[in-house]
Regions:
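Active-site gating/metal-coordination segments in enzymes
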Residues: 72-73, 81-168, 173-175, 216-218, ...
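Catalytic pocket-lining loop regions of alpha/beta-barrel enzymes
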Residues: 3-4, 128-129, 142-249
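Histidine-centered divalent metal-coordination motifs
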Residues: 24-30, 163, 196
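Well-formed, non-transmembrane alpha-helical positions, independent of function
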Residues: 65-68, 121, 182, 207
Length: 297
């Protein structure tokens, strides 16, 4: 299999789908995006590999790429790394969604004074998905100031894409499955979407998905050749992944990926060679139905 981006529409048509739903894509203010790309340009000393950005284009070109691929619903995920950033990032993401109907209204938050009010405001303005990045933000998900936020989002049934796995760079005391486990113990109905399948702690995050009915896992970068070098997925866990067909959603990390978008899809399709239950029905659920259900459509 050697899928190219030009082949992607034929790929999802073969599955009988009207397109793709990708819950882990990034659209950021230009200045912040340039800083993110600069970070990836310098990441080799931390992970041992270069990370060349595949889609280093302007915003209109990136939107056009999403549509050319047939991504019918995508997110504008952002994340704050310090106080007094989250509100403006949410404003940007919600404004983008207001201008582009295929962009899911997205928001973020940070453990700071007024966070509950910020999250409520985002919900009032139509936010359908939130994103936080504990590793970059350098905060513990269990911080007391966030407890009412988790309760609010659990009650609202709004998904939160959470990067709390220890990959690609561990942050002791901040990352790891125990942080999310602490939140879920208090808010068991939280719709938590674990980014990158929780890499590299795949098994521990599968434990949480098996224990809590609203924990989901996104496929972002998982199983790609690039990520298998950094955080290989234990083949012995594939049967457990297949046991949760309604709990896995497509994520890609577009545009900040070091390979064509199509490679994420072919990486998922080739899993059937090792676990036959990860078949076309599984791909349909992952690439369309599960994500659509989470965003309430």
């Amino acid at each position: 299999m050697n899928l190219s981006d030009n082949d992607v529409p034929a790929w999802w048509r073969r599955l009988g789908l009207p397109g793709l739903v990708d819950l882990h894509t990034h659209f950021l203010p230009e200045r912040m995006l340039r800083r993110v790309w600069a970070h990836f340009d310098e990441i080799k000393p931390l992970i041992g590999h270069q990370w060349p950005i595949q889609y280093r284009d302007n915003q209109e070109s990136r939107l056009a790429t999403m549509r050319r691929l047939g991504v019918r619903r995508f997110t504008a995920l952002s994340y704050a790394h310090r106080p007094k950033m989250a509100a403006s990032l949410t404003d940007f993401s919600l404004s983008l969604a207001a201008e582009h109907a295929d962009c899911v209204p997205s928001a973020t938050f940070y453990p700071e004074e007024g966070v509950l009010e910020q999250v409520q405001s985002a919900l009032d303005r139509g936010a359908r998905v939130f994103k936080i990045h504990a590793q970059i933000g350098a905060f513990d998900l269990r911080e007391p100031i966030l407890d009412p936020v988790w309760g609010l989002l659990a009650d609202a049934g709004i998904p939160v894409v959470i990067h709390v796995g220890s990959g690609p760079v561990s942050r002791p005391g901040i990352t790891g499955p125990d942080k999310l486990a602490g939140v879920l113990a208090r808010h068991p109905l939280l719709t938590a979407v674990v980014a990158h399948l929780g890499a590299p702690e795949y098994g521990e995050f599968l434990d949480l998905a098996e224990r809590y009915p609203w924990v989901h896992l996104d496929t972002t970068m998982a199983f790609t050749d690039f990520f298998e070098r950094l955080a290989p997925f234990d083949p012995a866990l594939l049967s457990r992944l297949a046991d949760l067909p309604d709990r896995v959603v497509l994520g890609s990390d577009f545009p900040n990926i070091p390979y064509p978008y199509a490679h994420q899809l072919e990486s998922l399709e080739r899993l059937r060679d090792r676990e036959p239950r990860l078949d076309d029905d599984w791909l349909r659920a992952v690439c369309w139905y599960n994500g659509l259900r989470l965003i309430g459509e």
